[in-house]
Amino acid sequence: MRRNGSYGQQILRNLVDENVNVGFVHEDLDHATGTAYVTAAHGKNAIVVVPSANYCLEPKHLENAERFFSTADLVLTQLEIPMNVVEKTYEFSKKYNKKLGIYASPAARISEEILEYASFIVAKSNELSIIFGEESREKILRKYPNKLFVRDDANSTIYHNGSEMKYHRNDPEDMPNKMGMGDAFTSGFSIALCHGNEVDDCVKFGNDVSLKVAQKRGSQTGLPRLSDFAL
C-alpha cells in the first residue's frame, strides 16, 4: 500500500485506529493515493480506478517485509498493484507454504501458475473473460472447484464444489451502498477460512459481512466487527 496527501493520511489513521500494523506502508512523495470514482445509473455501478501511488509499488518493497510472510496465516492480495508485485507475493507465499487469497479486482489476466497455487480467488461475474479468457462461466468454475468464487452486485456468490454448482445470495430490499461489497466478502471469507471452517460456511460468512457493508455508507467505516455477528 502506498500513500501521500490527505486521502492517504486518512486511510493510514483508520488502519492505526483498527490496530493494523502499518510498519511497512511505503509512502510515495511524488504520487497521490490511488482513488476510485463511482458512477451510478439505474441501479448499476461503474468504477473508474486511478491507481496513482499503488502502481509505484515494486517487488523490492515486499522484500523488505519478507520476514512477515513466514508468520502469516494467509496472504491476501488484490490487483490494484503491478502484476510483478502480485507475482512476488505469490513467490513468497509459496516459499513459506502460506495460503494465498486473490481478490481479482480490477480484473487482469493472472498466470496459470498463480491460479493453481492460490487457495481461493474471488472475481466479479462480468470480468471473468478478462481473467480466464472466453470460456463459459460454468466451465471456468468447474476447472477451479472450491477455489473460484464469482460475485455480482446482488450479493450472490457462485462456485463449484467438485460435484455441483453452489449458489448463495443475501439480497435485501435496502442496499444503499454496493461499494466495497467484494472487499468485505473477501475479508469475511478469509477470516472464516483461517478459523478452519468448511468452504460453504466461509462463503456464507463472506456474504454476511458483505451484506453489513451494503447496508451502511462508507466502504471502510461500514465494515463490521466480529462482535456484530451471532457466532
What residue spans do the PLM features occupy?
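Conserved beta-alpha-beta core of the PfkB/ribokinase-like small-molecule kinase fold
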Residues: 74-139, 155-157
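Residues that scaffold the ATP/ADP-binding catalytic core of kinase and kinase-like folds
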Residues: 48, 131, 213
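A general structural signal for well-ordered alpha-helical segments in protein cores
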Residues: 8, 34, 86, 186-187
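Conserved phosphate-binding/catalytic region of the ribokinase-like
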Residues: 109, 137-231
